[in-house]
Amino acid sequence: MFTGTGTALVTPFGGDGSLDEVTLRALIKRQIEAGIDFLVPCGTTGESPTLTHKEHLRVVRITVELTNGKVPVLAGAGGYNTAEVIEVARELAALGADGILSVTPYYNKPTQEGLFQHYRAIAEAVSLPIILYSVQGRTGVNIEPATVKRLAQIENIIGIKEASGNVSQMAAILNAVPENFIVLSGDDAITLPVISLGGRGVISVVSNEIPAEMSELTRLALHGDFSGARAIHRRYHPLMEINFVESNPIPVKAAMAEMGLLKPVWRLPLVPPKAENQARIRAVLESLELVEQIPAGRGAESAHAAIAS
């Protein structure tokens, strides 16, 4: 269900900082029409820490309604309070989500045993499939391969989004877990190495911009056509890289605004990219013919975006 390319959906906001439901619906429809494999609302790229609880549920509800069973929905439900994560997971199940992506507890930095008990408690409380989400660079805690192996024995913990950037660790996880346990890259740029080791795809940022192309990349790789997949990777690698020139999702939303897909609005503490980075983003988009080339200076207007508080 959660293999291939899953888009970590951005959350669009209006000029007043409110949830832009019209644009959200348009973005979801664009993803479906492009042939995306699954959608991931309310993750890191969706600015989930800045969403209210009501908004979080609303984004997932809209995603579920629009996909209407055509594309699986893996909704974000993670945090440092196990009881609250369970409550949110139950609400997402009631909304019709097909699974949950659950980031490791952050800030309080649990031990490996604490991580195991945290995820076991969630799995026992809901029947939905659970994808673990390990991203030490953001949370300060890593799910070690031995802990992933233990968690993989729990029936409805079916996979992990591994965003450590450590290919050796991903290989160790793949060697430790059952063959049907799904290991997904959390980094667009190393999707091909992960698939070559036995991974099953990627939860992608760049597919917000190029859903059809990223979906094709993983389909080719999963069917053994690494030559074709490499060609796509090489073409779009500059876009994958520029998406992280500042903290995600600042650059990807700036790029999407340049492409006319949404308003360039972030919620504090996220702010628009620096002018020089905005120019770099624009240059990459132009080089890939994702936007028209325009006279210097005019494309940087979106750098002065309103910031929603």
Where are these regions (language model features)?
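Active-site beta->alpha loop and helix N-cap motifs at the rims of alpha/beta catalytic domains
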Residues: M1-T7, T11-G140, V148
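Surface-exposed amphipathic alpha-helices with a cationic face
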Residues: V60-N68, R90-A93, A123-E124, A152, ...
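Glycine- and other small-residue-rich loops at beta-strand/loop junctions that grip anionic moieties
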Residues: A77-G78, T104, N108, Y133-G140, ...
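Catalytic cores of alpha/beta
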Residues: N81-L92, A146, I173, A189-L197
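Catalytic beta/alpha-barrel core
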Residues: I100, E155-G165, F181-L184
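Catalytic pocket-lining loop regions of alpha/beta-barrel enzymes
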Residues: N142-G159
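Anionic-ligand binding region
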Residues: V167-V205
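Structured C-terminal cap/extension of enzyme domains
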Residues: A189-S309
